């Protein structure tokens, strides 16, 4: 596909808004869920959002493959030849959604040559889109009307954001032992990348299990706001390069 154009972007914003409405309408059924093979929950909202997004994307860009959390069975023997594909989490933060927290989102990235060239994250609860086009600054769109350019705000005294369910992770605890002058805050889902891009927080260390669809759009958005996401060897995250669809431990930095 050629670089993302305004027509496709507009349709993606409308599509994620529609999926978000479905998710919000199913909040009362959030406790009705099953457990997948990887021990993560799956709700009716996950499935409904997945079905809508995939069906619309197949019509919008029929020549681009799609990898969604709910279709992750696609073998690497097929995926490894992809130079470009959509990487989707139709409902990121499912545990937060089940627990009644607003920290859930829809995450869509376009991967080109193992790296995200476009990222879009939508918060259905707040009706806020965060997105970045290739080689462009990251933007925040509130209620489909008000735009704001996102810029990180690095500080020596840091506000560190961590996953709501990861505070007991041994790697995270050990990592924070070596930092000074900081305060921690808990949030769920890929919205943490967006909150750093907005300048609300300054640092997000992740040491627990994390899949590639959990990070791709957020990485793209944070980089477009002036931040970076690197693994523990100071390398940028690479996508669809191994059989496993797992992101390594990383640090998201303003």
Language-model region placement:
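DPxDG-like acidic metal-binding loop motif
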Residues: 76-139
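N-terminal subdomain of lithium-sensitive/metallo-dependent phosphomonoesterases centered on the IMPase/IPPase/PAP
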Residues: 1-91, 174-177, 235
């Amino acid at each position: 596909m050629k670089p993302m154009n305004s027509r496709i972007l507009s349709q993606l914003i409308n599509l994620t808004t529609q999926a978000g409405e479905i998710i919000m309408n199913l909040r009362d059924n959030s406790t009705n869920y099953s457990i997948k093979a990887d021990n993560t929950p799956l709700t009716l909202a996950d499935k409904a959002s997945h079905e809508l997004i995939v069906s619309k994307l197949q019509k919008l860009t029929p020549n681009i493959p799609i990898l969604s959390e709910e279709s992750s069975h696609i073998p690497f023997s097929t995926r490894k030849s992809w130079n470009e594909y959509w990487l989707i989490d139709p409902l990121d933060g499912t545990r937060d959604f089940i627990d009644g927290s607003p920290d859930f989102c829809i995450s869509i990235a376009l991967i080109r040559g193992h790296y995200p060239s476009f990222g879009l994250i939508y918060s259905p609860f707040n009706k806020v889109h965060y997105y970045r086009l290739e080689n462009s600054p990251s933007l925040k769109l509130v209620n489909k009307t008000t735009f704001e350019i996102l810029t990180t705000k690095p500080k020596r005294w840091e506000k560190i954001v961590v996953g709501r369910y990861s505070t007991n992770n041994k790697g995270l605890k050990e990592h924070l032992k070596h930092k000074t002058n900081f305060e921690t805050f808990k949030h769920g889902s890929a919205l943490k990348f967006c909150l750093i891009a907005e300048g609300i927080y300054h640092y997000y260390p992740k040491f627990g299990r994390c899949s590639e669809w959990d990070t791709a759009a957020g990485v793209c958005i944070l980089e477009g706001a002036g931040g970076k996401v690197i693994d523990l060897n100071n390398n940028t995250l690479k996508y669809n390069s191994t059989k496993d669809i797992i992101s390594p431990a990383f640090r998201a930095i303003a």
